[in-house]
Regions:
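Non-transmembrane, aqueous-exposed alpha-helical and coiled segments at domain scale
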Residues: 1-195
Length: 195
């Protein structure tokens, strides 16, 4: 079931994103932006009709788990997710993106050391588990940047940093652009908050 879900999200954008693209496209009057919205909408429709990923770079899978301590499969969950990624890679098919960096080879299964990435939120005395999946391709993560600002920079410093990144590096990102901004006490916390 999880493998089917992973394959599905590689082919279909969330309904709210599709609706927003159609809404923005209908409001656009300039020729080039209107053509871009039409292309994204057509691409999404074709991906669903042809049962193919909507992007060639389906990314490296990341999972966020909100899992109860009494969930019956808590001990097997990471292994099950890894196996689901392998199955989805061949069934969808998803592009083989997972590379063992220092060994310099592609696993061809989208799994490897630390891949897929799994973040845990453990809920005491619960037997429920929620799984959130995200495909982080190079086109969306390439322009990502983290920075430690001086405490006195305040909201203005954050705003300046975000706008500078969007105008400098956002040009290289794949549309539609969804900007995540995380503010935290460390770079690691801020990066996770931005997701």
């Amino acid at each position: 079931m999880v493998a089917d879900f992973v394959a599905h999200i590689g082919k279909k954008l969330p309904d709210d994103v599709v609706a927003k693209l159609e809404e923005l496209g209908s409001q656009e009057t300039a020729a080039l932006p209107k053509a871009l919205y039409e292309t994204m909408t057509k691409n999404q429709k074709l991906a669903v009709e042809l049962n193919r990923p909507s992007c060639q770079d389906t990314g490296v899978l990341q999972f966020w788990l909100k899992c109860g301590t009494n969930f019956p499969y808590i001990n097997e969950l990471e292994g099950l997710l890894k196996e689901a990624v392998v199955q989805a890679t061949f069934a969808a098919p998803l592009r083989h993106n997972s590379v063992e960096t220092f060994d310099e080879y592609n696993t061809k299964k989208n799994v490897g050391k630390g891949t897929p990435t799994v973040w845990w939120d453990i809920v005491p005395n619960s037997d429920k588990c929620e799984i959130y999946a995200y495909m982080a391709g190079g086109g969306c993560t390439l322009p990502g940047k983290a920075m430690v600002l001086m405490p006195g920079a305040g909201y203005e410093g954050i705003t300046d940093f975000v706008l500078d990144q969007m105008t400098s590096y956002g040009l290289n990102a794949c549309p539609p652009l969804l900007v995540g901004v995380g503010v935290g006490t460390s770079i690691e916390t801020a990066a996770l908050n931005s997701k």
